[in-house]
Amino acid sequence: MNFANRLTEETGFVEPLQSQGEVGLAPRTIAFATIQDECSAVAAAIKNKIDQGVKASEIAVLYRVNGQSEAIENALAQAGVDYQVRGGERFFNRVEIQAAIRAIRAEAASPSEKPVFQAVSEICRSLGWSTQPPAEAGVLREKWESLNSLLAITDELPAEATIADFAVELDERQRSQHEPIKAAVTLSTIHAAKGLEWQIVHMIGLTEGYLPITYATTEAELREEKRLMYVGITRAKNEITLTWAKRDATSTRDREPSRFFNQLLARG
């Protein structure tokens, strides 16, 4: 709790909380080269905890927007860890993703010489994606994030992959991300996690552009973003791990860690 309270020291946007339970493990902050590395490591850590006897229902992965869920959904599926998405649809069930997959399958049926990234980016553009995210929150931003995550999958394919290979990859991912039939790890936006707690929490994707979100520009908006970071951290009863990745497959620039780390880590 003291770790989260560092975010309140300068602005006082919320009354500092006092922990009522036993002292948990020291918070961890970890940087990764790529989003895939980040999510694979988080999935492996979660599987290790479950293998040690921690209930899956006592573990959560939190992120700023729904569009960030695809990479961790895939990593957990690959690790054989059941999960449930709180307050939102699973990635491959979203309307825009279903539309994109139909278009990708149609493109794969008539092979061309286009590189996979070009072919998929053209499909995503036809569905509303662009190189720059919408300036405001809401449905359009969520749709953009989902399509952006779909496009990012192309970066994981071998250089010689075709659009047909990409269609097969998407089919395999859909099959692996089945509905859980038992207690599962929770995936959630920070907003949807308000009021809930878990023994172990992983907060992922903590970069500039996500937390704080791109369209948060005023002092009040940035204060609200800091409050979201605080809310996320305080969802953990015993262990909190905060991670971010430098490499973004759909951007020409590397990402920077969230500015809120400066305040959190000021005293080590």
Task: Describe the role of every protein-language-model region.
Residues M1-V81, E107-A108, W144, D155-E156, ...:
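Helicase P-loop NTPase motor core
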Residues G12, G24, R86-G87, L206, ...:
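Residue-level signal for pocket-adjacent positions within structured domains
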Residues Q18, G88, I190-H191:
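Short, solvent-exposed loop/turn elements at beta->coil junctions and helix N-caps
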Residues R28-I30, Q84-R86, S188:
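General small-molecule cofactor/ligand-binding pocket signal
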Residues A33-Q36, R90, K194:
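Residue-level detector of flexible, active-site-proximal loop/helix-junction positions
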Residues Y63, R90, K246-R247:
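Conserved beta-strand edge residues that scaffold enzyme active sites
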Residues N66, G87-R94:
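Conserved helicase motor
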Residues S69-A79, R94-R267:
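Conserved helicase C-terminal RecA-like lobe
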